[in-house]
Swiss-Prot record:
The gene is crh2. The keyword Hydrolase applies. InterPro entries: ConA-like_dom_sf, GH16, Glyco_hydro_16_CRH1_prd, Glycosyl_Hydrlase_16. Its EC number is 3.2.1.14, 2.4.-.-. It catalyses: Random endo-hydrolysis of N-acetyl-beta-D-glucosaminide (1->4)-beta-linkages in chitin and chitodextrins. Residues 1-20 form the signal peptide. The keyword Cytoplasm does not apply. This is Crh-like protein 2. The active site is at residues 164, 168. PROSITE patterns: GH16_2. It is a lipid-anchor; GPI-anchor. Residues 21-306 form the GH16 domain. The GPI-like anchor contains a phosphoceramide lipid group. The anchor position has not been determined.
Length: 443
């Protein structure tokens, strides 16, 4: 769910006004971003531009309006994967969801009318996020997972305040898919569970996976068969006096990443089935690990009862509670003029961006967050929950747990990114990355 880079190997445009420092400022609940770099990314780093788009955490940013408003839900079916025209690189995307439904980092491909997420040798994989947020709805995808120890495929919903609903496929176990959920990133390893898949081959066979997210319940289904149901009422926490239930607008994300990378936490590697084999059958031919996505559908539900509706275009947070009641639907614009712009001033750099000037308005370390396709809630993490409420209640569905996928990973335009893993842990009530060394190469 979240990653905060401990160091970044920068490969930026020749910028005249960008700081030479290799590390962006860090952010947490107790240390918000400075006004100069007001947006807190999923990785707990501060910046402008893409830092302020999808994944920007308003609770750790300079102010709630540092992050851009997020495009409202759009019901749609995606089934023509004959090209990648509907995907924008995260080093190019500035928030116009009307031009690109998806933003990506890594190595997406198309083959036989399907979308492939690929992971070449020693790379950090691929992550694709839908640019239209969902505030309750149903998502369904036809998937053939990746395979192999240490290789993980994700199909999830993730909000900017780190509510999360997951499907995770561990390549060492092709007979099951893992389900999980989180509220504001609070770690509770009792929230996970395994769902068996008929035929016992998530890699070789197509299966249809559905998340049906309603204000009062979440249902996970495989091939139309309900595998798990979570009732909101079962998530009430007596300590915090609140429901630890995913309830804020979320992005659909698809990912493939190396959970079994040698640099990861031992518990993470064990959960992933062992260290990844970079000389495996798939690495030899076709030359990469891969997960295959076919038709993907999004059905948007009506806003919850009592929702604060002031428009029809975008979601914003109006208070720092990060709850369903904190969300407002507005007509605010969602598009930045440049990578130097933020939610505080979305028109910064309009003229220089148009002229192609290489300065803070170009993509760089402090304007495009970097990470990889996996993050968060990893086994072996000893850190505790975020809201000071202790461990949230469990629905008793099992104790299995896995990673959740984040967003905003940087795309490499040549070769492979450095093999590192950004893992989410909690720092007070927010996240800090354990490992993040990614070579950022802008397109």
């Amino acid at each position: 769910m979240v990653r905060i880079g401990s160091s970044l190997l920068l490969a930026t445009l020749a910028a005249t006004t960008v700081s030479a420092a290799s590390d962006p400022p860090k952010c947490s609940q107790d240390s918000h971003c400075p006004e100069e770099w007001p947006c807190c990314s999923l990785y707990g780093q501060c910046g402008t531009g893409a830092y302020c788009l999808g994944g920007c955490d308003p609770l750790m940013s300079f102010s709630l309006d540092s992050c851009t408003p997020e495009p409202i839900c759009q019901g749609k079916t995606y089934k023509d994967w004959s090209n990648l025209d509907n995907l924008a690189s995260n080093t190019k995307y500035l928030g116009d969801a009307s031009k690109s439904d998806w933003v990506y980092s890594g190595y997406p491909k198309v083959e036989d009318g399907n979308l492939l997420l690929t992971m070449p040798k020693n790379s950090v994989g691929t992550l694709i996020a839908n640019n239209h947020y969902i505030w309750y709805g149903k998502i369904t995808a036809k998937i053939k997972s990746s395979r192999g120890a240490g290789v993980v495929t994700g199909f999830i919903l993730l909000s900017d305040t780190k509510d999360e609903i997951d499907y995770e496929f561990v390549g060492a176990d092709l007979t099951n898919v893992q389900t999980n959920y989180y509220f504001q990133g609070v770690l509770d390893y009792n929230h996970g569970g395994n769902a068996s898949v008929s035929g016992g081959n998530t890699f070789g066979d197509w299966h249809e996976y559905t998340i049906d997210w309603k204000p009062d319940a979440i249902t996970w289904s495989v091939d139309g068969e309900v595998k798990r149901t979570l009732k909101k009422e079962s998530t009430y926490n007596e300590t915090s006096k609140q429901y630890m239930y995913p309830q804020t607008p979320s992005r659909m994300q698809l990912s493939l990443w190396p959970a079994g990378q040698a640099s990861n936490a031992p518990g993470t590697i064990a959960w992933a089935g062992g260290e990844i084999d970079w000389d495996s059958e798939d690495i030899k031919d076709p030359g990469y690990y891969y997960a295959t996505f076919g038709e993907i559908t999004v059905e948007c539900y009506d806003p919850p009862s009592g929702a604060d509706i002031k428009g029809t275009k975008a979601y914003i947070f109006k208070d720092k509670a990060g709850l369903e009641s904190s969300v407002q639907i507005t007509n605010n614009k969602t598009v930045l003029a440049s990578f130097g712009a933020t939610g505080l001033d979305m028109d910064v750099g309009a003229s220089s961006s148009a002229s192609g000037s290489a300065n803070k308005t170009s993509s760089s370390a402090n304007t495009v967050p970097s990470g990889n396709g996996g993050s968060g809630n990893e086994p072996g993490n000893s850190h505790s929950g975020s809201s000071g409420s202790g461990t949230s209640t469990s629905d008793g569905s099992g104790s299995s747990t896995g990673f959740s996928q984040g967003s905003e990973t940087s795309a490499s335009s040549n070769k492979n990114a450095a093999p590192s893993q950004n893992e989410r842990v909690l720092n007070g009530s927010f996240f800090a990355v354990l490992v993040a060394v990614v070579a950022l190469v802008t397109l």
